[in-house]
Swiss-Prot record:
Localization annotation: Nucleus, Nucleolus
GO cellular component, one term: nucleolus
GO molecular function terms listed in the Swiss-Prot or TrEMBL record: rRNA (adenine) methyltransferase activity; S-adenosylmethionine-dependent methyltransferase activity
Other observations noted: Present with 623 molecules/cell in log phase SD medium.
Record organism: Saccharomyces cerevisiae (strain ATCC 204508 / S288c) (Baker's yeast)
Gene3D superfamilies (alphabetical): Vaccinia Virus protein VP39
Broad class of where this protein is predominantly found: nucleus
Keyword Methyltransferase set for record: yes
Superkingdom, taxonomy of origin: Eukaryota
Name of protein: 25S rRNA (adenine(2142)-N(1))-methyltransferase
Record carries keyword RNA-binding: no
């Protein structure tokens, strides 16, 4: 008789102790990745507000729980709020508070009284429980890797190869940087156009270095720069419009003269945003020296390829968000420089 534990997360039965690769259904992968990033970002904001002495480790939730408990050691009341949050299943009230977290932190940053701490530790407990129910880092990594499988249509670099092949076929020494890499087996790594592909991500995978691009040391010389930078489904996870702009600026610093940047965004970022559309994005990137060579919009994604100009870029007029659309149901994705 099969136990419940002998099932994989897809519901298929699996031998206990086997090395069978767990597979997540394609319709679930993007939802899991998005949910994981949402929870991690909210947790980081709360921990920064609470000034925890030790940074959390997204790969070790048991350790994280101990760090949080240590921060409230001796405070029975805050411990109770934390446990209360951990006991709550998914609910609209808590999700609503997470969506309003930035405003909550802004309003409470001056006081940090007992009621403020109670709210934050309750939310922190809720997030910890949600991450645990999601399956933690292991499930996130499986979802990420499944999303890159060729048979699931998840490799966004297939279109990139088509666009750049003629430019790189006769450049044997070309090097590329893939930000937010999910797999060492995607097209950018297998197309044989690059002497070396440096793959980085916030989480370590096989063939992928654990590194935050914003903390990567700046190039010391041209040899440290890249002919191509791929930034696929990364900018949309950066927490605010200013940080997205800072990331765009930083990518330019890593490019060789006339180097290329490949950007992929969820389609909604340029079709259903109050502060961004395809024209604004093109003009904004143009202001930092990037000209668009190709673009493509699918049912769910927007792909674009830019090249660094030789001429100096124009002064930026994108220091504030510009409303380009208005109405219900729009998101607030935007980029400022």
């Amino acid at each position: 008789m099969h136990s419940r534990k002998s099932k994989s997360i897809t519901g298929k039965r699996k031998q206990v102790g086997s090395n069978v690769t767990r597979v997540i259904k394609p319709q679930k992968t993007r939802r899991i990745i998005r949910r994981f990033h949402h929870l991690i970002n909210k947790r980081q904001s709360i921990c920064k507000f609470l000034c925890l002495k030790e940074n959390l480790d997204d790969s070790n939730e048991e350790k994280n729980d101990k760090i949080i408990r240590l921060s409230i050691k001796g405070n029975v009341r805050l411990g109770k709020y934390y446990e209360d949050g951990k006991s709550q299943s998914f609910n609209d009230a808590m999700e609503s508070q997470l969506l309003r977290l930035h405003s909550l932190i802004k309003n409470e940053s001056k006081s940090k009284d007992t009621s403020d701490l109670a709210v934050m530790y309750t939310l922190l407990g809720y997030i910890m429980n949600q991450i645990n129910k999601l399956g933690g880092l292991e499930t996130y990594q499986i979802a990420s890797q499944n999303g890159q499988l060729k048979e699931r249509g998840g490799d966004t670099s297939k279109l990139l190869e088509k666009w750049i092949r003629s430019s790189f076929e006769n450049c044997p020494g070309a090097v590329a940087l893939e930000i937010g890499s999910l797999s060492s087996g995607n097209r950018i790594s297998r197309c044989a156009l690059f002497r070396n592909v440096v793959r980085i991500d916030l989480e370590e995978h096989e063939g992928v270095i654990k590194q935050d691009f914003m903390e990567r040391p700046l190039p010391r010389n041209e040899n440290d720069k890249f002919d191509l930078i791929s930034c696929s489904l990364v900018l949309n996870f950066v927490k605010n419009h200013r940080d997205r702009g800072a990331m765009c600026h930083r990518m330019v610093k890593f490019l060789k003269p006339q180097g290329y940047i490949f950007i992929v965004l969820p389609q909604a970022c340029v079709t259903h945003s109050r502060y961004c559309d395809k024209t604004l994005l093109q003009n904004l990137l143009g202001s930092i020296g990037l000209i668009m060579l190709n673009s493509h919009q699918s049912n769910k994604l927007y792909y674009c390829l830019y090249q660094l100009q030789v001429v100096p870029p124009q002064p930026s007029s994108f220091s504030k968000r510009i409303k380009v659309n208005d109405g219900p149901g729009l998101n607030n994705f935007g980029i400022t420089l």
